[in-house]
């Protein structure tokens, strides 16, 4: 139990295999490296210690600890239901498809070029949540004016709405990043276009002056 606490502490101590990084082992690793013949001549203890000198592969999935917190390798936004929070907005705008005479509800993907209403729907839902937040705030003021002991339920409702707004904004960030990148590229293109126009203008002026000589 104490070992786990040490590993997960804010500033964990050096790993136990740090003791194998001696001058002798460092020299032996430089001489042997990954040469199987030279490694075969080493003792079993030396080969076990030299394994720690080989750089490990980067992890593809799972989680890791850093400064006392657990972080996932793949940075994914968890669902509100996974955090035990009620979701107050529609996840995506459903699309009705007709197949073999039957209708099915299909959720468009954010990467789908035909699902332009996906992010528009997020904007609409965020506006609804903001209006709901203002309404609940006014109701909270009314409750405090009548009976201040009944504020806890309304305050919890406001907390859930605020978390939903925050989560919805985080879902919108990929679209915001893409639009910001498009704006940056457009600014760079406009800047290069102006530079080309200026260069062409200077070239025309030089040619006209040379023609007058």
Curated annotation (Swiss-Prot):
One of its GO terms (molecular function) is transcription coregulator activity. It comes from Kluyveromyces lactis (strain ATCC 8585 / CBS 2359 / DSM 70799 / NBRC 1267 / NRRL Y-1140 / WM37) (Yeast). This is Mediator of RNA polymerase II transcription subunit 7. Component of the Mediator complex. GO terms for biological process: regulation of transcription by RNA polymerase II. Pfam families: Med7. GO terms for cellular component: core mediator complex; mediator complex. Transmembrane segments: none annotated. Belongs to the Mediator complex subunit 7 family. Keywords: Activator, Nucleus, Transcription, Transcription regulation. It comes from the Eukaryota. Residues 97-120 have a biased composition (Polar residues). Component of the Mediator complex, a coactivator involved in the regulated transcription of nearly all RNA polymerase II-dependent genes. Mediator functions as a bridge to convey information from gene-specific regulatory proteins to the basal RNA polymerase II transcription machinery. Mediator is recruited to promoters by direct interactions with regulatory proteins and serves as a scaffold for the assembly of a functional preinitiation complex with RNA polymerase II and the general transcription factors.
């Amino acid at each position: 139990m104490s070992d786990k606490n040490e590993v997960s502490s804010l500033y964990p101590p050096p790993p136990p295999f740090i003791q194998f990084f001696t001058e002798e082992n460092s020299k032996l690793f430089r001489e042997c490296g990954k040469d199987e013949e030279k490694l075969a001549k080493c003792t079993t203890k030396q080969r076990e210690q030299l394994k720690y000198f080989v750089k490990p592969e980067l992890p593809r999935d799972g989680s890791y600890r850093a400064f006392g917190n657990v972080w996932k390798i793949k940075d994914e936004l968890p669902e509100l239901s996974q955090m035990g929070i009620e979701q107050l907005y529609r996840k995506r705008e459903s699309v009705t498809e007709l197949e073999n005479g039957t209708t099915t509800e299909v959720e468009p993907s954010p990467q789908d070029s035909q699902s332009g209403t996906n992010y528009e729907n997020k904007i609409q839902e965020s506006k609804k949540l903001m209006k709901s937040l203002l309404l609940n705030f006014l109701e909270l003021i009314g409750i405090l004016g009548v009976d201040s002991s009944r504020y806890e339920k309304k305050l919890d409702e406001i907390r859930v709405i605020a978390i939903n707004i925050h989560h919805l904004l985080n879902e919108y960030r990929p679209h915001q990043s893409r639009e910001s990148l498009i704006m940056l590229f457009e600014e760079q293109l406009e800047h290069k276009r102006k530079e080309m126009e200026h260069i062409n203008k200077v070239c025309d002026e030089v040619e006209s002056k040379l023609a007058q000589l």
